[in-house]
Amino acid sequence: MADGLNRVHYNPSTAQLVEFALLRGEGELTANGALVAKTGTRTGRSPGDRFIVKEPSSAADIEWGPVNQAFEPGAFEGLWARVEAFLADKELFVSDLEVGADPEHYQPVRVTTQYAWHQLFARNLFIIPEEFNRQDKPVWEIINAPDFVCVPERDGTNSDAAVILNFAERKVLLAGLKYAGEMKKSMFSVQNFLLPAQGVLPMHCSANVGKDGDTTLFFGLSGTGKTTLSADPKRFLIGDDEHGWAPGGVFNIEGGCYAKCIDLSQKNEPVIWDAIRFGTVLENVVMDEHRVPNYKDSSLTENTRAAYPLEHIAQRKEDNRGAEPHAVVFLTCDVSGVLPPVSILSKEQAAYHFLSGYTAKVGSTEIGSTSAIQSTFSTCFGAPFFPRPAGVYAELLMKRIESFGSQVYLVNTGWTGGPHGIGKRFDIPTTRAIVDAIVSGELKNVETVHLDTLNLAVPVAVPGVDTNLLNPVNTWSDKALYAEYAQKLAEAFTKNFAKYQVSDAIRNAGPKA
């Protein structure tokens, strides 16, 4: 990006970016010191507008389809040039950042944004290195031009906006989008493509570590509890959303957190509550007349967010890294009310449930999602972000679990006693008690009961949890109806899993329809 007539601010500080954002009318300051910005009509990710350039160096390794849509190299060149021309006379913000808190597996990235608040977001979510690009790797480039309007007939896009990844040229283009989450997820997709070739499993999970150095991972889609459960006052946070698992340890891909704010309370989520202060970006959060954020207000979107650097969390692992995990938790939000609150999985069951990624779209991060809650299967608990075929990630997971001996658990943060609308959702204290028992190792060799239809082993007792909750059939007043719903869920699993080419051992580890 030429530094000609336009003013370019290199590596600006938090205070400078907040000032610029306020002066330029990009946002407002809240009573707690955070910067609130609104993202217009797109208040979540736009999966229909995400593309990967189809070029010889990467084409054979990508699972092309509705998630990874192909974009022509020539069309990309033209669009990139038009966006550069559009930004040529604009004031711009540029930072040299990194993705991946690991000396071997990081990627250097130069982020250029039209908006000051987007630059603040990038500096909060990516890693600000002490010394940029120590290994002198080729640098990735992100350009974010939210005011550029794409023209599908001219640009080859599907709408007025696009997110395009180009692996050959190490470029990410964001045009016509104000929702900042697209920036972080685009670099996550980049690492999800690059890391497996280095023998590293990229994961859509949160991670924390205990005083004794024991690491726990929490996999799950948006709204299932990854951020809430990993922000544990008794443990040290590694990160809340994106990690790599290499032989020998786990590392955060990011340098910050992107926490959901809907119904946020100091009582239930003290770590997140305290992290929202000066330097934090609040996305689409509504304020009252005294500028106090009203976290209950979903009038703009259910998907309200807080973006803050890990430095805002007192109890964190300062190097953003941890040992290999003793415990791995798959968080699922079961809207049918059928799954138990906790199950203990074999490694084959772990691969089955990892590939299935069964959960619900709760406060979905995708545009057009309303509060209607529906069940979904999202491969690897993050289908929208994984460019390679699912089997690549499942095999890496099995390999890591086997070589380290990690124990995997399936934890339901959804409903019990009936489906959504009839049953009730497990409360956070119940799930926390289950997680406490998992991380302390109390569930490692316990007595279990086998649920035949679901093909799951359920502990008969968990410290601090009402025993009646553990076997889901006990929470339903109509036992026949429970059996019917369990059968329906087993059939949904089997139907979804038919597309995977896996060993019989893995296929037979799922529910029995």
From Swiss-Prot:
Q: Where does Mn(2+) bind?
A: K185, H204, D241
| Disulfide cysteine pairs (residue numbers) | none
CDD domains, per database record: PEPCK_ATP
The alphabetized list of GO BP terms reads:
gluconeogenesis
Q: Which PROSITE patterns match?
A: PEPCK_ATP (PS00532)
Q: Which GO terms describe its molecular function?
A: ATP binding; metal ion binding; phosphoenolpyruvate carboxykinase (ATP) activity
**Is Lyase tagged as a keyword?**
yes
List localization entries.
Cytoplasm
Q: Name one Pfam family in it.
A: PEPCK_ATP
Q: Which cofactor does it need?
A: Mn(2+)
**Positions that bind ATP:** K185, H204, G220, L221, S222, G223, T224, G225, K226, T227, T228, E269, R305, T431
Q: What is its EC number?
A: 4.1.1.49
Is Glycoprotein included in the keywords of this UniProt record? no
Assigned protein family:
Belongs to the phosphoenolpyruvate carboxykinase (ATP) family.
Q: Which function does this protein serve?
A: Involved in the gluconeogenesis. Catalyzes the conversion of oxaloacetate (OAA) to phosphoenolpyruvate (PEP) through direct phosphoryl transfer between the nucleoside triphosphate and OAA.
Q: NCBIfam families per the record?
A: pckA (TIGR00224), PRK09344.1-2 (NF006820), PRK09344.1-3 (NF006821), PRK09344.1-5 (NF006823)
Name of the molecule in the record: Phosphoenolpyruvate carboxykinase (ATP)
Q: Organism source for this protein?
A: Shewanella sp. (strain MR-7)
Report which gene this protein is encoded by: pckA
